[in-house]
Amino acid sequence: MKTANKQTKLHVRKNDTVVVIAGNDKGKTGKVLKAYPQACRVIVEGVNIRKRHVRPSQSHPQGAIIEREFPIHASNVKKG
């Protein structure tokens, strides 16, 4: 049986300014950096920041702990 690949449409796009309406970052505003329509998630600048450990490389010879944005569900943001 084949499953339908339904294309989902998000109410926000890249570079839109949005306000977080639910979750730990409620009330914060930021620009949408990337949208994932299939997963119904967006990455918002300065929102949902987590720390990631990075292995040693040429850019980080000793390794590092980097803070970066992670996706949040699109239903938790509104244009604003």
UniProtKB/Swiss-Prot annotation:
GO terms for cellular component: ribonucleoprotein complex; ribosome. Keywords: Ribonucleoprotein, Ribosomal protein, RNA-binding, rRNA-binding. SMART domains: KOW. InterPro entries: KOW (IPR005824), Rib_uL2_dom2 (IPR014722), Ribosomal_uL24 (IPR003256), Ribosomal_uL24_CS (IPR005825), Ribosomal_uL24_KOW (IPR041988), Translation_prot_SH3-like_sf (IPR008991). CDD domains: KOW_RPL26. GO terms for biological process: translation. GO terms for molecular function: rRNA binding; structural constituent of ribosome. Part of the 50S ribosomal subunit. One of two assembly initiator proteins, it binds directly to the 5'-end of the 23S rRNA, where it nucleates assembly of the 50S subunit. One of the proteins that surrounds the polypeptide exit tunnel on the outside of the subunit. Belongs to the universal ribosomal protein uL24 family. PANTHER family: MITOCHONDRIAL RIBOSOMAL PROTEIN L24. This is Large ribosomal subunit protein uL24. It comes from Prosthecochloris aestuarii (strain DSM 271 / SK 413). The lineage of its organism: Bacteria, Pseudomonadati, Chlorobiota, Chlorobiia, Chlorobiales. The gene is rplX.
